[in-house]
Amino acid sequence: REEPPACTAACPLHLDMRQACALAAQGNFSRAAGILRKTTPFLHLLAGCCNAPCEKSCVMENLGDGVSMQVIEKACALYGGSGAMNRFMIPKKKKIVALAGEDLFCLGCCWELGKKGYEIHWYTGEKTPQEILTDWGLSKEEAAADLGSLEGFRIKKFPIQSGDGSFRDTCMQEADVLCVSPAFRGETLPETCFVGKGYQEVSWILADAKYVALKADRYLQGADFEDVSEPKTDKSRLFVTMDGVTGSKAVAGVETVTKETAQEEAARCIQCQCLECVKGCVYLQEYKRNPRGAIREIYNNMSIVMGNHMANKMINSCDECGQCKAACPNGFDYPEVCRIARQVMVETEKMPPSAHEFALLDQEFSNREGFLARTQPGYESSAYLFFPGCQAAAVSPETVEKAYKNLSGRLKGGVGLMLGCCGAISDWAGREDLFTSALEKIQREWEKQGKPQVICACPTCRKVLQEHTDLEPKGIWEVLLQLGVERVASGTASIQDACGARQDAQARAQVRKFVEALGCQVQELPMAQELAPCCGYGGLMPYANRELSLKKAAFAAGQSQGRILTYCMACRDQLSKAGADTCHILELAYGVEPPGVPDLSGRRANRLKLKEKLLREIWKEEIPMEEKLEIIYAPGVEAQLDDRMILKSDVQAVLKAYEETQAAAEDEEHGYLITNCRIGNVTFWVKFTVSEKGYVVHGAYSHRMTVE
């Protein structure tokens, strides 16, 4: 995105014609002229004498006429005001630059060195500066206008004749460096001398003057002047889509420029920029960043030793979905930068644990209390192992149950079951240690069951296990297609592609075949396949930036007014929150009515209930139930808990601690008791009253301070 447009890249002076056109299109020729005069003041000269490589390279040239940059330059020269600099604003430098010659190159050097504050001793012939410009075809009025920019500079003129070498000794006695016109290239010159290249085109001559003046300036500052880049043009690497752009003809020529025609011509500029990654990414839109600029900010944030890390939230808010990489013509992998940044900042203790602690505790719960690994009853090992993932068990446990029973009844050799988390949560959080631990646990259980074929119901789980383990998992949609799918639906439906399948075209194709086999006709969304937007769950966005997560969900849901099918349960959950008519393809296949959107406490409860039910009904095992307090929640409190990421189990723990200590403060105004308990790194406070039916909770909040 930060690459120069084609017109700038093709110009030896690298004039910012894109910005000039934007301002001229608004009728603001004064500011447009100011943009151009930052590079060169000779606007009449460019408008009349430049061969305009910018126009030939303009992308509009492919559809009609390129934007006439010379018209814009002429209008800026005519209506952009004087280019004279305030001489009081130019800091004076003590050193003197000698300049020899009587051509356009010397005028360019006068401008470049004069604006830097140097005193210039110009050894020239009989030609006046005005005559130098009129020799290029400018009128006296135009020449005077262009030369107005040199007013206020400290320029002293001395006579010289070409071929007379005596000036060298004279000028070098007074000056600190010598800049010489290409006309003197054949003469013997001192080492402290910089000579022009001898270009013929106007833009190249002025670019050469800029190059020589910069070398002289660096020499006078004692800096390395050998690495100064020579004038050059290049082909722009900026990707510009022409979708929806229609060609047009130039409005007017340079000879007939008016404010109106110039404004109309400038409006033909399409303001070339690459926004491919931003189009479908609410995150980049929200933070108003392009990936390169964001990476600079991330680098600076990581480099801070003492002080506030202001970009932490931006780093943690990326969903790491890979859409921007897929959309980028150059495959720029911004999500990987965010992932590495999180990991490094966690390792160096620059990332506070509060950002992702709740999600990491949820992973710990899935792989501890909610974990289950069993072979099918009657089998000591498994030919297959069903791994539905933590989100499916949390959002739609009935679907997991029906899917397992269906697979175990149709596949031979025994189908094992593993309930747990693949570790993607800890990978997103930058916790490589927890990620490795989760993968090792899965690997061990897989080996215990005889290294069966793993069947995943979650595309992210499948991607993680495929990339980081030896399991070689298959998607459940692929297995069911091979077994045969019953036609249970009709009509059209769109598919929200999962981020976990963004790089897996085969999986996306299989899902579409599966949906068609169910009886639905697939209607592709505007942004689908590898360019599908994230639902807003990836990268733990709901925990780091809930508001942005909801915006992403709304953006994804807004792609269709009809039914949207998902093959990721997190997508189904997020789209449901956004009000979309949506269900998971397995819910559709097994006739499960989508159960709505469970809150954070409900998600954990669903995992436990599923585990208990399967153990009881399939493996005939009973789990001792933990005795719970009778708690009634006042209206609105459950929503408050979910919004503040406080679990009902946390409330249970606080009230159990109260029963042991009887420590509470009384809110006399409302008649509440307020008690607290520290669980892990968080102190929870609960407002409650006691009734005949149990505790009535009227509110809760938390913080990370320790109360002593």
Annotate each predicted stretch with a short phrase.
Residues 134-141, 391-477, 500-519, 523-616:
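Cofactor-cradling patches in redox/metallo enzymes
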Residues 184-189:
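Flavin (primarily FAD) binding-site architecture
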Residues 221-268:
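Mid-to-C-terminal Rossmann-like scaffold of FAD/NAD(P)H-dependent oxidoreductases
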Residues 604-605, 609-708:
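Ribonuclease/tRNase effector modules and their secretory precursors
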Residues 174-183:
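Short hydrophobic core segments
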Residues 195-223:
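A conserved FAD-binding loop/helix module that cradles the flavin
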Residues 5-7, 18-170, 288-471, 608-617:
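Iron-sulfur-cluster electron-transfer modules
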